[in-house]
Amino acid sequence: MERASLIQKAKLAEQAERYEDMAAFMKGAVEKGEELSCEERNLLSVAYKNVVGGQRAAWRVLSSIEQKSNEEGSEEKGPEVREYREKVETELQGVCDTVLGLLDSHLIKEAGDAESRVFYLKMKGDYYRYLAEVATGDDKKRIIDSARSAYQEAMDISKKEMPPTNPIRLGLALNFSVFHYEIANSPEEAISLAKTTFDEAMADLHTLSEDSYKDSTLIMQLLRDNLTLWTADNAGEEGGEAPQEPQS
């Protein structure tokens, strides 16, 4: 199928909310070997974020049921729950591996500017983070190191090449701070990164273009929400919700 046709079908699949189809079309477009435009890389991100989002939610529900049945000593239900959770886990790992393969084989190498490179390195960190959520033992440690490395490389580039209010830079800092808090067990680092990012963006808010204003201020609000939650948790209070990250 022609590249233009794949992109068009991905847009149709998005409108129909058929995200697995959308992901398959965008995978085909990436494998054609041309650099993606800004619109196209967003299509890729939305497609896989929706596919993996459903799997992450299902895995969390099943893990919770499995834990409860283990605590109750339910020999009847336990093996079935574990088997189904493992099935979902395998599917989730497959999607993450596909995305990471596209990033390493095509997207990061073909990125022609700093913004694209940061976008794809952030994506790499995100998909290693999703793998870390379901990993155990030595595997988990290796995956966490890979996520941290991708996020850090993206942070280094974004600080040199992008203003503090750039929505991609803000989204990266938001997700890296969630990684510190949820995956790496480093609440102080999470709070420090979120606070510094928010403060620097606030100081630079007057430079924002009308196009970026909505995206940037939305991510800044998510940073502030997470900061409120995390500082309350650190003070020994119960957090009311999971840390937030952008939807695309």
Curated annotation (Swiss-Prot):
SMART domains: 14_3_3. Keywords: Cytoplasm, Nucleus, Phosphoprotein, Secreted, Ubl conjugation. Present mainly in tissues enriched in stratified squamous keratinizing epithelium. Ubiquitinated. Ubiquitination by RFFL induces proteasomal degradation and indirectly regulates p53/TP53 activation. GO terms for molecular function: cadherin binding; identical protein binding; phosphoserine residue binding; protein kinase binding; protein kinase C inhibitor activity; protein sequestering activity. GO terms for biological process: cAMP/PKA signal transduction; establishment of skin barrier; intrinsic apoptotic signaling pathway in response to DNA damage; keratinization; keratinocyte development; keratinocyte proliferation; negative regulation of innate immune response; negative regulation of keratinocyte proliferation. The record marks 56, 129 as: Interaction with phosphoserine on interacting protein. The modification Phosphoserine is found at residues 5, 74, 248. GO terms for cellular component: cytoplasm; cytosol; extracellular exosome; extracellular space; nucleus. Homodimer. Interacts with KRT17 and SAMSN1. Found in a complex with XPO7, EIF4A1, ARHGAP1, VPS26A, VPS29 and VPS35. Interacts with GAB2. Interacts with SRPK2. Interacts with COPS6. Interacts with COP1; this interaction leads to proteasomal degradation. Interacts with the 'Thr-369' phosphorylated form of DAPK2. Interacts with PI4KB. Interacts with SLITRK1. Interacts with LRRK2; this interaction is dependent on LRRK2 phosphorylation. This is 14-3-3 protein sigma. The gene is SFN.
